[in-house]
Structures are given as C-alpha cells and as structure tokens.
Amino acid sequence: MARRSVLYFILLNALINKGQACFCDHYAWTQWTSCSKTCNSGTQSRHRQIVVDKYYQENFCEQICSKQETRECNWQRCPINCLLGDFGPWSDCDPCIEKQSKVRSVLRPSQFGGQPCTAPLVAFQPCIPSKLCKIEEADCKNKFRCDSGRCIARKLECNGENDCGDNSDERDCGRTKAVCTRKYNPIPSVQLMGNGFHFLAGEPRGEVLDNSFTGGICKTVKSSRTSNPYRVPANLENVGFEVQTAEDDLKTDFYKDLTSLGHNENQQGSFSSQGGSSFSVPIFYSSKRSENINHNSAFKQAIQASHKKDSSFIRIHKVMKVLNFTTKAKDLHLSDVFLKALNHLPLEYNSALYSRIFDDFGTHYFTSGSLGGVYDLLYQFSSEELKNSGLTEEEAKHCVRIETKKRVLFAKKTKVEHRCTTNKLSEKHEGSFIQGAEKSISLIRGGRSEYGAALAWEKGSSGLEEKTFSEWLESVKENPAVIDFELAPIVDLVRNIPCAVTKRNNLRKALQEYAAKFDPCQCAPCPNNGRPTLSGTECLCVCQSGTYGENCEKQSPDYKSNAVDGQWGCWSSWSTCDATYKRSRTRECNNPAPQRGGKRCEGEKRQEEDCTFSIMENNGQPCINDDEEMKEVDLPEIEADSGCPQPVPPENGFIRNEKQLYLVGEDVEISCLTGFETVGYQYFRCLPDGTWRQGDVECQRTECIKPVVQEVLTITPFQRLYRIGESIELTCPKGFVVAGPSRYTCQGNSWTPPISNSLTCEKDTLTKLKGHCQLGQKQSGSECICMSPEEDCSHHSEDLCVFDTDSNDYFTSPACKFLAEKCLNNQQLHFLHIGSCQDGRQLEWGLERTRLSSNSTKKESCGYDTCYDWEKCSASTSKCVCLLPPQCFKGGNQLYCVKMGSSTSEKTLNICEVGTIRCANRKMEILHPGKCLA
C-alpha cells in the first residue's frame, strides 16, 4: 500500500511539472464569515470561489489549492459589568449626629472591560433620634480637663504651650512657667510621622497622632544641616538626622512578570484583621521594609502596560534618608480631629459610621520609619527582545544599574562595560540598554513633584540634564515622604478614651467587613493563570510570564503550560457559636479549582474566632472602659481541702449546675447546646480523691440552625432548625435568580455546600438573552439562534438534574448550559427535575420516565422539560403535569403487559395508562412490551 502511494505521488508530481502549476489566487476568497462568538474565542471561515474551468482541470488546481480556511477570532473575554446590590434598610437614627445611614455592597466587580460602578455605596440622611446621645465623658480624676474633654497632666497648665489643642489650659493664668529656656522650632515635616496609613490603598491618610504636643518635656535633637536644635514631640521615642546618598546603594531587581511582585516572600504584604481575615496584596518596597501601592495609579499603569505584550520588568531604586524616627509604644497623644471622631462614634455598632474612620484616617499608623525620598523606576522590556539580546537576567540588571549611574546620577568614575553597549538590544538604540525598554513606570516618592517628574524616563528622550537629580535630591530635604516604615493597626490607638473596649471591638468588626471589600476572591478567574487583583470596583488581571493581552488571554510562542492554578473563593458566613464560645467559617479552593496539574491554594481553609456576647442586649451596647475589661476566667480560683474542680464538658455541651467547686458525692449534669442531643450517661460524680467518675458522653449534632442570608432571598421551608438530611431552597423575586447554588443540605455540623454571606439575587440572564425566542435561544438582530454553552452561560443559572443517554448516567447541570446544548440538537440529554440530583422518589421517577419516553408518540416542549403521552403542559408553571388514567386515549400501538399491585392477573395497557399509574407512584410491574398473551 505504501509503495502504491509513493508511485501515485511521483506520477502526480510528474504530471504537475509537465503542465503549468496552478495559480490558486486566480480563484478569489469570499469574505470572512462573522465570528461564531462575540467574545471568549470563536472561529470564522472563508471559502475559495472555485470555477471548474479548463485552467482548473489542466493545472491540477483541485489537488493544489486549499478550498477553505479557518481562523480564531474574538478571543477576548466577555465583559463583566459591575453590579451593585440594593440598599439595605436605614439604620437607627444616631442621636449624636442626628443622621442615619443605609449601605449596599458590590455584588460583582467589573472585569474584562465591563462597566464600572460609580454610584456611592453608603447614603446618609438627617433624622430625628428617639434616644438620647450617649457620649460618655472621660473621667479625668486628678488630671486637668480641657474644654474639648481631653485629659492632660496638671503640670501642663500655664506653661505657655497649647497642650490642650484648644488653649484652655493656658486660660486665666497669672504667671506662666516656660518648659524650655528658649524657643525651638518643630522638626520639619514632623506632622507626616503622625498621619494614618491606608494599607489597602497604599497611601497616607488623616492625622492620628498630634506631633505638635511636647508633653511638658524639653527634649531636642540637632541636625548637621542647621545650628539650631529642633524640639522633639512627646509621641516620638527617637529621632536621628542623616543624609544618605551613597552611589553603591543603587539596587536593581528583575521580574519575569508582575505576579512575582505580590508573591515573592521577601516582598509580600498581607492584610489581617481580628478574626483572621487575611489576603496577600502586591507591594513595592523601598529597602528593608514594605510600602504597599497595590491600588494606586502606578501599579495599575504597570498592569496595563504588561497587557500590551509579553513583558519582563527591571526595577531600579535608591533610598535617600533625611531622618529616622521611632514612635513610642504606649501613652500616645492622639490628634484632636482623630480623638473627636472616636468620641462621636456610637456605642451601637454601625458599619457605615465605623468604616468612615478607615476612609478618613487609614487602617494603620507609623511605629517607625524615615523621612526622605526614593528614586524608583520600573522599566518594562519585551521578553522576546531581552531573550534575543543574549544577556542573562543578572547582566541585564547590571546594565540598567551602570547606565543609571552614568546618565542619571552622573557618577564620574562609572565605566560602562562592553557587553552593555554591544548586545543586540543596545545596538538598536545607539549603545543604550535603557532606551531599549518599552516604557518606565515612575514610583518616585518625596521631593517636589516637578523635579520628580523630570527624573522619569520616556522612550526616545535624549536623557537628563546633569543637575536634574541633584535638584530633586535637594528638594527631598524640604519635601520628604515617609519611607521605610513599619506599621501597627490603628485600632491599637483606641485606648484611654470613654468606652474604649466597646469601640475597639466595634472597630475590629468594621475592619473585617471593610477589608473584605478589597479581597480579589470576588473576581472571576483570569485566563492563562493570570492573578486577579481588585482595584476599587474593577478587577484587573496580572499576567504570568509568557502571557499578555487585556485580560492575559494571549500567549507567547514558547508558552506551553495548560495547567490551571487554584485560587480561593470568598469566605462563607460565620457559623453559630459552639460550646467553647467560638465560631468558624470556611472557604473553598474553587475560583478556579486546580486543573491539569495546577497548584493548590496556599493558606488556611478554615478560620476560628472567639464569640462576643452582650449581657445587656435589650438595653443597648454597654460602655466598657479599659479598666473594666474582666472575664470570669480572670477571677481567682477557689482553693479547698476537699471536693472537685469544675469538669470539662464535652464539645458543644455545658454543665447545667455550673459552679467553681463541687462537694464529694455531688453530681453535675451535662446538657447540650441547641441543635445537639446527649448520647451516653450525662451525669458526672465527684470522688473523694478530687477526680470525676464519668462515662462516655457526647453531644451529637441533630440539627442545623437557619442560615443568615440577605433579605432579598427567600428560604423554603422556613423554620428555625433543620434536622440532618433536610434541605432548603433559596429563591428570588420574579425576574431574578440566585447568584450561586440554590439548594443546600444540612450535613454534619454545617450546610453543604457552604452558604456564602455575599450570596444574593441577580437579573435572570436567561430571560434577558432569549428576548422573544424559545428557551435555549437568543435574539440576534431579528433572528433567533441557539445560545453558546461557553459564551452565553458563564453566569450562574439554577441547577437541573439531567440524564445523559450516551453515558447512561445522571448529573447536575446549569440550566443555561442544558438548554443551549438541547437547542444545538444534543438529543441525548433528558431533563429529570429542577435542583441538584438527590437520591429519592423524584430521581427514581425521573429515570423511569426517561426510559419510558423513548416509545412516546408525543413530545411537546414545556419549559425545561418535554411532555409525553401521559402528560400535559401547564401554561401557568411551564411544567409537565400527569394525566389521570381515564383521561388517556384508548388503544394505540405502544402496548404493555403489566401486573397491578399484588394481583396475579395480567392486563394490557397503553403507554399513556402505564405512565399515569407510575406517575401516581402506584405499584405496577411491566412484564413485557406488547399485548398479554393470555
């Protein structure tokens, strides 16, 4: 056979050579067809317009010319528009500010070029309070009370300094006693050290520490630049002036992609709050310590630049310090504006009011750092051009560092090495390696803005003037920024004010909710293992090395991996409190799940925290001060010569007759929390040796508590407790569907699958897409075409239980995908019932009905379903409803021989009668198809 093929080829080749080769372009191509998809990668084709004429036949055009071409099109991801939830109810009227608020959340951030959300998430309105304003005044005891309510030491009265901030401590003074023998100026820019810092936004916010307060102490520090010392504020432990400009501290770093900026161990910042909610954020650093700029324009600019081509980045940075500082560990003097904001917070938790603290003052404060500036540029290079240059990563970093020393710092002794000017990339740009970069992103901080802007590099520019860097360096001394800093949570500053413990607890709760708004778990997975990051209400994709495009959808020629790394989904809502007064929550590695050898998610799957209870729940939140925070466990233990200490109850259990010490022979009774029942002997007896005689006893869960869901969702059936094995269904108002699974089952100690606290309703995309078309179709101009399972079904739709006749198996499928495939003539799929596949009568009848349907003469579409001979379609519910046996037609070709109930006699029934009897769940045995023989 092989020899015959070779001979045929030789003969064909000889004939072609003998004749004239076909000029295929003689037959023009048609226009490319429209793309099969508008997004998410489709295909289009074109055909050659063949005319079988003499030329075509004589020149073997049939064998030579391709008649059809296909290409990929519209590979960009479908845009996801930002979706805001509805406003919740108005909060109670705050009696102190006479305002109330309502809040809504971002249900879905925008992504892949979708429309962003611009409307506010919080609304305020004036109101008439029904309660008195409960702003507690500080108990100054032996201290002086300022008009503002602040307490200061008595020794600070009449010292000629405004220690109160409102000058009330210097009023009605006969004589004043100066603290210092002469007047000293404050440290330049000392107020910057007292600003708050928003860790999630990566920028300083309002003043939280009053660094004009000196505390009646005359402590000074001297700078080498001036002869006059500066006064040191009371909040600072140490201050040291220095000017650091050494040339050899110029650092360079190489990044194959921007994801390594966020995942490198030495450069990773993580945000955490009380309760353990944490996630990593990409950061840029100055030297040893971290500075987060995740959400500012520089990082966004870098991401957008990386989308245009497969890129690598070289970062060069140099730190110039003017002074170093360390903040005191305790007894810090808060700024008036921050103190006033804290004092006006209500005792009752109000998410909107408490979250404003973080908007205005940030999430952290500076515990140490430096004032100065940072020369910092991030150069973007084409990965392909860097590879073709012949330089290694270390050599490329070295060339950027050497050229920066020569062309920016104008270091006199810098020698440019031969390899940095003669490689293939530098040769294209007159010996300059930096000129081969695509662009640079400026991360310069400190100094006057016009000098900082002049240091930024632009492609094609002639270079910097020699004085540019020195001018910026001088301006850093007058206009420094806080750099190389360390942070502590701003919540730690809430001490020694009225109701400090109550407000600290409320702020921790608010910070946990506030931080969740920045968690990229809300984003859809990015193509090619891109890492999503949330910027405001927009999700951006940070591309892996070897990928690029607006959403990382394009691959460089040498990118071969098809693995999908796992990413965390969002946390579930907190569970109810157990017997140890703790609650927990979980998350799943499913956004996306690891596929084709991809990495598993790093981090914890489950978190646990202590529960808090209000002992005055009906009287509002109590005011607890710092010196009043005591728990029962802090009470001294009672020592006795005989008896037994309190025993440890089983998990999810408690002691009914609880006390600290029990007499010999005394019994304790073990009871279980709601939703649990006692299994075993529930009495312990105190023995003379101080131990307990106890049998095996445990609290086994028997019920799940009704989950907490958003108001727009309806729970069916609605009850307080559900036994193990019971299920609930979540539904939405007409025109909306649940934006996630709708069915949940009580299993073990939780609901399965976990119920997300962000679960809500969204517009029914199926209804919107189909327009005036049938289910499974969408409107395209004036025509109805089948929906694409991949393109049109990326949104959530309700679950259906479906049977596949090819695999002879049933499975749960999204409704949209089922309808789209059914429209595309996928006849092997059969609807069983709404909801996920669960063992039981509904599934059994669905499978039996599918087997019986193969012989049905009637097949009428009805919603998701198809009605058969023994059914009719209900117009009101779009569901198939079984007929009664007398409503069936008589006779017919599809007959069966059956036995009814416990009867031994045989009976012939048609397919309609068989279907109605089995639908009513009456006992019947089908003996064989056709009439009974007897």
UniProtKB/Swiss-Prot annotation:
SMART domains: CCP (SM00032), FIMAC (SM00057), LDLa (SM00192), MACPF (SM00457), TSP1 (SM00209). Glycans are attached at residues 29, 32, 38, 90, 324, 392, 568, 571, 574, 855. GO terms for cellular component: extracellular exosome; extracellular region; extracellular space; membrane attack complex; plasma membrane. All cysteine residues are assumed to be cross-linked to one another. Individual modules containing an even number of conserved cysteine residues are supposed to have disulfide linkages only within the same module. Residues 642-934 are annotated as: C5b-binding domain. Residues 22-79, 81-134, 565-612 form the TSP type-1 domain. Residues 780-839, 876-934 form the Kazal-like domain. Residues 642-701, 702-763 form the Sushi domain. It is found in: Secreted; Target cell membrane. Residues 858-934 are annotated as: Factor I module (FIM) 2. Residues 138-175 form the LDL-receptor class A domain. Ca(2+) binds at residues 156, 159, 161, 163, 169-170. Residues 176-522 form the MACPF domain. Residues 523-553 form the EGF-like domain. Disulfide bonds join 22-61, 24-65, 35-73, 39-78, 82-117, 93-127, 96-133, 140-151, 146-164, 158-173, 180-218, 399-420, 499-623, 521-570, 523-539, 526-541, 543-552, 577-611, 589-601, 644-686, 672-699, 704-746, 732-761, 773-823, 784-801, 786-837, 793-816, 862-873, 867-919, 880-897, 882-932, 888-912. Keywords: Complement pathway, Cytolysis, Disulfide bond, EGF-like domain, Glycoprotein, Immunity, Innate immunity, Membrane, Membrane attack complex, Repeat, Secreted, Signal, Sushi, Target cell membrane, Target membrane, Transmembrane, Transmembrane beta strand. Residues 611-688 are annotated as: CCP 1. Residues 1-21 form the signal peptide. Membrane attack complex (MAC) assembly is inhibited by CD59, thereby protecting self-cells from damage during complement activation. MAC assembly is also inhibited by clusterin (CLU) chaperones that inhibit polymerization of C9. Component of the membrane attack complex (MAC), a multiprotein complex activated by the complement cascade, which inserts into a target cell membrane and forms a pore, leading to target cell membrane rupture and cell lysis. The MAC is initiated by proteolytic cleavage of C5 into complement C5b in response to the classical, alternative, lectin and GZMK complement pathways. The complement pathways consist in a cascade of proteins that leads to phagocytosis and breakdown of pathogens and signaling that strengthens the adaptive immune system. This is Complement component C6. It comes from Homo sapiens (Human). The lineage of its organism: Eukaryota, Metazoa, Chordata, Craniata, Vertebrata.
